């Protein structure tokens, strides 16, 4: 297992951090704003920071980076006390578009640096886009860089052939798809595993799952809290999302208990291979939808990316 440190008292003392490959410290639990309406994002981010979150995860394609920046400013926290992640949208996955989009994200977020920038999808000219991340990293615009939704083959490819290997890979990870083998590869490559949809988007009865509920009853916690705690103990960074403050408070309250070997074995057994991926990046229909909806429609001229 990797070691985790605790953030300074000026940030969130109860949230441990993971050291990325270049030494940058990243909180092991953060707040995601996927599908949060732009008009609600500022409030949600401000409340999340008030609750104690110090990692905020957004993306260009979420169309709410500006709200994230406003929420951070409203919080009164110093910029260096909050870890900001955003992602290059599919429409920007060429070298030149990615480079320009990084500057636009900086403008919308209202900051002169981003803590972590990821390529959102392994499509289009992602190698060219990744070179833009490397350049921005060398220029000091990005403290750390990485990828999202890269399956093991693609991850190994980019990790072994780039000057600055990805430091993080954010992939679908939850009780029903824990990605144990992919996690081993990430660890061997020095890549930190981050989970999107740690609650499986509420599917498969996760919040009433009898195994998770039984573990929760043992520790006085909810099924959701057990899920987050188990993933963290598996060395996975988690970014749950909620627009309700009470749920934000519940999701962050996972550092005052630990799961034992029996609990972790029961949790691991939930991944029996029966739950389909929420989004399969090897399904041609999914990729066709992604390209048509997120790339072609974003460019009225219909110009090809490359």
Question: Which role fits each region the language model picked out?
Answer:
Residues 11-18, 66-73, 102-104, 152-156, ...:
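Alpha-helical scaffolding within the catalytic cores
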Residues 21, 69-81, 103-110, 135-137, ...:
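Acidic (Asp/Glu)-rich catalytic clusters
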Residues 36-39, 58-67, 91-96, 122-127, ...:
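Acidic-and-aromatic substrate-binding clefts and catalytic sites of carbohydrate-active enzymes
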Residues 36-49, 94-109, 128, 153-156, ...:
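Short, acidic/polar
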Residues 1-82, 199, 294-295, 299-306:
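N-terminal binding-site loop/beta-alpha segment at the start of enzyme catalytic domains
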Residues 121-306:
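Beta/alpha (TIM)-barrel catalytic core signal, keyed to glycine-rich beta->alpha loops juxtaposed to Asp/Glu
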Residues 87, 91-135:
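Glycine/small-residue-rich loop that forms an oxyanion/phosphate-binding "nest" at active or ligand-binding sites
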Residues 55, 113-116, 144, 168:
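Residues at the N-termini of beta-strands
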């Amino acid at each position: 297992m990797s070691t985790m440190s605790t953030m300074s008292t000026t940030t969130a003392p109860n949230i441990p951090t993971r050291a990325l490959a270049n030494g940058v410290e990243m909180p092991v639990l953060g707040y995601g704003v996927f599908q949060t309406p732009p008009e609600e994002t500022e409030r949600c981010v401000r409340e999340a920071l008030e609750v104690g979150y110090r990692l905020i995860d957004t993306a260009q394609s979420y169309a709410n980076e500006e709200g994230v920046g406003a929420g951070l400013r409203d919080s009164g926290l110093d910029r260096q006390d909050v870890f900001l992640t955003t992602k290059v949208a599919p429409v920007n996955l060429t070298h030149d578009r990615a480079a320009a989009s990084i500057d636009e994200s900086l403008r919308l977020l209202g900051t002169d640096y981003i803590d972590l920038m990821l390529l959102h999808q392994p499509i289009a000219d992602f190698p060219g886009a990744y070179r833009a991340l490397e350049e921005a990293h060398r220029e000091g615009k990005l403290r750390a860089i990485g990828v999202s939704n890269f399956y093991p083959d693609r991850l190994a490819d980019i990790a072994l052939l780039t000057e600055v290997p990805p430091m993080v890979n954010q992939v679908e990870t939850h009780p029903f798809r824990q990605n144990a083998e992919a996690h081993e590869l990430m660890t061997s490559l020095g890549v930190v595993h981050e989970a999107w949809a740690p609650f499986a988007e509420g599917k498969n009865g996760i919040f009433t799952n009898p195994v998770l509920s039984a573990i929760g009853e043992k520790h006085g916690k909810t099924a959701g809290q057990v899920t987050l705690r188990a993933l963290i103990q598996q060395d996975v960074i988690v970014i749950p999302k909620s627009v309700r403050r009470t749920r934000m408070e519940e999701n962050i309250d996972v550092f005052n208990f630990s799961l034992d070997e029996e609990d972790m074995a029961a949790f691991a057994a939930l991944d029996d291979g029966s739950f389909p991926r929420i989004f399969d990046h090897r399904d041609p229909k999914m990729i066709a939808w992604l390209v048509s909806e997120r790339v072609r429609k974003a460019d009225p001229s219909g110009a090809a990316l490359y």
